[in-house]
């Protein structure tokens, strides 16, 4: 029994942070995909693929520049806000509180080792957060689209 409990604890701990076959990882509702490009180039590529797929890019926030203005240092960090009512509205129809997490955001950042990542909120995590039921198709559609956008921007 003790061995079973220890094994279960280890399994749950390890499953809390996992890497997919494509190198992406998911932890606490955040999907992170490694990029082969720098932060600016990754964000530029993401913006390009988003607009080519009919998404609206509302803004790009360069947190590194903001930190400099405040006299602080921050590794390269940019956020891209984007969306499309045709995609977001079905999720909000499932649960109106989903609107707090829309439009979608993508974080492009450099870690302490110099690696660049593109991170975004996992739609399945958001569905759970907002207690969305019976909307699996809409959640899966958004999840698939975000994964494709991330792949196109990071390769």
Describe the residue ranges of each PLM region.
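Extracytoplasmic/secreted envelope proteins and their assembly/folding machinery
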Residues: 40-43, 47, 64, 143, ...
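Compact, glycine-rich, soluble single-domain proteins
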Residues: 47, 51, 55-104, 108
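Terminal, regulation- and interaction-focused segments at domain boundaries
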Residues: 21-54, 155
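Positively charged n-region of N-terminal signal peptides that target proteins for export
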Residues: 1-4
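Beta-strand/loop substructures that line and gate deep hydrophobic ligand-binding cavities in soluble
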Residues: 105-132
């Amino acid at each position: 029994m003790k061995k079973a409990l220890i094994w279960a604890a280890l399994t749950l701990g390890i499953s809390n942070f996992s890497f997919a076959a494509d190198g992406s990882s998911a932890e606490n509702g955040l999907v992170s995909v490694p990029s082969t490009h720098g932060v600016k180039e990754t964000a530029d590529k993401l913006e390009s693929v988003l607009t080519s797929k009919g998404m609206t890019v509302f803004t790009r926030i360069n947190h590194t520049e903001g930190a400099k203005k405040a006299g602080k240092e921050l590794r390269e960090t940019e956020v891209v806000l984007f969306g499309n009512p045709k995609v977001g509205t079905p999720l909000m129809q499932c649960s109106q509180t989903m609107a707090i997490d829309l439009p979608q955001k993508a974080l492009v950042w450099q870690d302490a080792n110099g690696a660049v990542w593109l991170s975004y909120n996992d739609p399945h995590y958001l569905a759970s957060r907002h207690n969305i039921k019976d909307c699996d198709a809409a959640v899966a559609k958004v999840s698939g689209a975000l994964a494709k956008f991330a792949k196109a921007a990071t390769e």
